[in-house]
Each structure stands twice: as structure tokens, then as C-alpha cells.
């Protein structure tokens, strides 16, 4: 059965989703406050905030935005206003790929049929999924363009992960990884690096087969790091850890948008399926070592430091950023390259104090922009 692709556009409009921790204002623990928060939100925020698998998680999401700058303004307002309503419920918002110490066994599942289905089918695998990601949608003109962008974005997923790595701690321990989140999530079926599709028909055939064999209801149960999203007319990047600082989330959004534009507009852009085996190895290195990793470059047949690749990507993509109006935001990637990802900062704080509460306090403070729309 065809998977109809809603016609997108050639302007690379975008949308961003951020999954955030709901933490107790005094203990720093994850708390199941989503129902209370949702019940208090004013009507104009209702469509911008969503439930997730657990009651200690909420998602904020932008509408379709024409530019990265527009998305930044929306996210700033959402972080501020939703954060204020969360505070009115005795909790705080914190953004990272994992919570440093809260236990997954203590989390309450959200009452929703889809989530009930996920827990019933995946059991222990799903109960451990107390993780938080940033998703970026970029509109593309049609289905074949979606597959071209899919392959090129998948090639760059390891670099994007290294830049976003923000989950060194989990269940009260140092995992030894810069991004432990992706290691946790890859225990899901149909997760991790996606298939290397040669054309849209191959994606449709995959979806048909998985539905026919009873693995899933529809393509939204493909939880890959990158996936076409036909209902929205977009390509969706899902590999990013949630970012503590909004400016880093915005920089990664700009990088994603520019990669998609480059994949469809550059005459010398690679065509066809990406080299999935190499991408899998590079992703492992990104998860383990973040920006200290070196990735294998298939064309040059050598390992290249992640920071060098990031700098080169920014320089190569600047013309697209200028055209899209996000050059300043794209240059924010260099701040991450020089200053380190969120994992580095979390470790610096913990190594100094030995107290995970200080890490959570940093996450809360970093997540909070200038507050707007205080509850009355």
C-alpha cells in the first residue's frame, strides 16, 4: 500500500520538538506532574505542549517556522512560559539527554492507548526509556527528495550526535559515554541508524512489510535516528540529545536545515544510499567519545577528528545558511566545538562538587530563558 507523501515545499521550512524533564524543585528528582501542568496551561499553549511515554516528561514543539530565527523565538517563549506554569506546580523544567540519577523503575507511564501498547509489547525495554531528545523536521518538495535528504542526513548523524551529546549520567552513575541516551534507545526495535533506501518505493515496501508481519501499525513506529515523515512532508532528525542551552539547540537546528538544503541543491552532493556500516561505526564512536571521536571518512579513507569535520561542515554550509537566513545560528556550532558539548559541562560540575544535585541545578538554570507569561 502506498505511503502517501504530503507535498512539502522547497523553502525548507522547519519545526522543532524538545523533550524536557519535569523535576521536583527541591529534590531534583523526576516527578509525575504532566497532568497537573497540562490542566493549568492556558488555551494558547495547549497545542504546543504534548505528553510523552512517562508522566515526568513533557514535549514542547514549534509550529511550522519559515526560519531558524523564528523557531528560536518560539522555543524561547515556550521554555519560559511552560517553565513558569511548571514552577506553579512546584516543579522545574530541565533539559538534557538523560536525568543524572532518577530511577526508571520509579516513573509512571502516561495513560494513553499508544503508550499502553508500547509498554505491553516492549516491556522492560520501554520501561527504561526515560530519555530526552530534540527532533528537527525540515520540509522537502516530495518523496524522492525526502529519500535523498534521508541518506545524506543519516551520513551526518554521527557528527550531529557528537555535537549534541548531553547524557553522560544515568541511574546515578557515570556511563563512560558522552551520549548514553542513544545506547538506551537502540534497544527499541526499528531504532538507531535507518535503512539505506535507494528510492521512496523501497521505504514504502519496508513499511508495508513491517505492517503485514504485525511489527507495527504504521511508519511512526519506525523510531530511527532519521526518517521520512510523509504525513508532514518532512525529513525528521531524531538522533540529537536534548540541549540544556537554547542557543545550542538552535545551532543544531540550523546545521540540520543546511545539511538538508545542501543534499538537494549541491551538484556535487552524493547520491543514492548512504554507507550504513561506516555510519554505524561512526555513531558508536560519537556516543562513546563525543567530539573527542574521530570518524572514518569513506572518500578519504582515513579517520578525521570530529571537531575538524564540524568546522569543515560549517564552512561548507555557510552559503546555504546565508540563503536561509541562519548564518549566525549556524556559527553557533563552533561554540560547541570550542567549548564542548553538554556532557563535558555536566562532568565538570560533578567532578568539582561530587553532587548530582548540582548537576540538576545547572540543567534547570541553563534550560530557563528569560521568563515570560508568569502565571497569575
From Swiss-Prot:
Molecular function GO labels: ATP binding; glutamate-cysteine ligase activity
Source species, domain of life: Bacteria
Catalysed reaction equations from the record: L-cysteine + L-glutamate + ATP = gamma-L-glutamyl-L-cysteine + ADP + phosphate + H(+)
Keyword Glycoprotein: no
Keywords on record: ATP-binding, Ligase, Nucleotide-binding
EC supergroup of this enzyme: ligase
Pfam families, sorted: GCS2
InterPro entries registered for this protein in UniProt: GCL_type2/YbdK_subfam (IPR050141), GCS2 (IPR006336), Gln_synth/guanido_kin_cat_dom (IPR014746), YbdK (IPR011793)
EC number(s) reported in the record: 6.3.2.2
Transmembrane segments annotated in the record for this chain: none
Protein family: Belongs to the glutamate--cysteine ligase type 2 family. YbdK subfamily.
Cited function: ATP-dependent carboxylate-amine ligase which exhibits weak glutamate--cysteine ligase activity.
Protein name: Putative glutamate--cysteine ligase 2-1
Species in which this protein is naturally found: Rubrobacter xylanophilus (strain DSM 9941 / JCM 11954 / NBRC 16129 / PRD-1)
Amino acid at each position: 500500500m502506498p505511503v502517501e507523501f504530503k507535498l512539502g515545499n522547497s523553502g525548507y521550512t522547519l519545526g522543532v520538538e524538545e523533550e524536557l524533564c519535569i523535576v521536583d524543585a527541591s529534590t531534583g528528582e523526576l516527578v509525575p506532574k504532566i497532568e497537573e501542568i497540562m490542566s493549568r496551561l492556558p488555551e494558547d499553549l495547549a497545542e504546543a505542549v504534548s505528553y510523552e511515554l512517562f508522566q515526568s516528561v513533557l514535549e514542547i514543539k514549534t509550529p511550522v517556522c519559515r526560519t531558524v530565527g523564528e523557531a528560536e523565538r518560539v522555543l524561547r517563549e515556550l521554555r519560559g512560559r511552560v517553565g513558569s506554569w511548571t514552577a506553579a506546580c512546584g516543579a522545574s523544567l530541565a533539559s538534557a539527554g538523560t536525568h543524572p540519577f532518577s530511577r526508571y523503575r520509579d516513573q509512571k507511564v502516561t495513560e494513553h492507548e499508544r503508550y499502553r501498547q508500547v509498554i505491553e509489547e516492549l516491556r522492560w525495554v520501554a520501561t527504561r526509556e526515560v530519555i530526552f531528545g530534540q527532533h528537527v523536521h525540515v520540509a522537502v518538495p516530495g518523496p524522492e527528495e525526502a529519500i535523498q535528504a534521508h541518506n545524506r542526513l543519516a551520513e551526518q548523524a554521527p557528527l550531529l550526535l557528537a555535537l549534541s551529546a548531553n547524557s553522560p549520567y544515568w541511574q546515578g552513575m557515570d556511563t563512560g559515554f558522552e551520549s548514553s541516551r542513544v545506547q538506551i534507545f537502540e534497544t527499541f526495535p526499528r531504532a538507531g541508524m535507518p535503512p539505506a533506501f535507494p528510492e521512496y518505493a523501497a521505504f514504502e515496501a519496508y513499511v508495508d512489510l513491517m505492517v503485514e508481519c504485525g511489527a507495527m501499525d504504521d511508519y511512526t513506529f519506525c523510531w530511527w535516528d532519521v526518517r521520512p515523515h510523509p504525513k508532514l512532508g518532512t525529513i525528521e532528525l531524531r538522533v540529537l540529545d536534548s540541549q540544556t542551552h537554547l542557543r545550542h539547540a538552535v545551532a543544531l537546528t540550523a546545521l540540520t536545515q543546511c545539511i538538508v538544503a545542501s543534499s538537494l541543491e549541491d551538484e556535487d552532493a552524493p547520491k543514492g544510499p548512504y554507507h550504513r556500516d561506516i555510519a554505524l561505526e561512526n555513531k558508536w564512536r560519537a556516543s562513546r567519545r563525543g567530539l573527542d571521536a574521530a570518524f572514518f571518512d569513506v572518500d578519504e579513507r582515513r579517520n578525521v577528528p570530529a571537531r575538524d569535520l564540524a568546522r569543515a561542515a560549517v564552512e561548507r554550509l555557510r552559503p546555504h545558511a546565508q540563503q536561509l537566513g541562519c548564518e549566525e545560528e549556524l556559527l553557533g556550532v563552533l561554540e560547541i566545538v570550542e567549548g564542548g558539548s553538554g556532557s563535558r559541562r555536566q562532568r565538570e560540575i560533578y567532578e568539582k562538587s561530587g553532587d548530582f544535585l548540582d548537576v540538576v541545578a545547572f540543567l534547570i538554570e541553563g534550560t530557563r530563558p528569560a521568563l515570560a507569561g508568569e502565571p497569575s
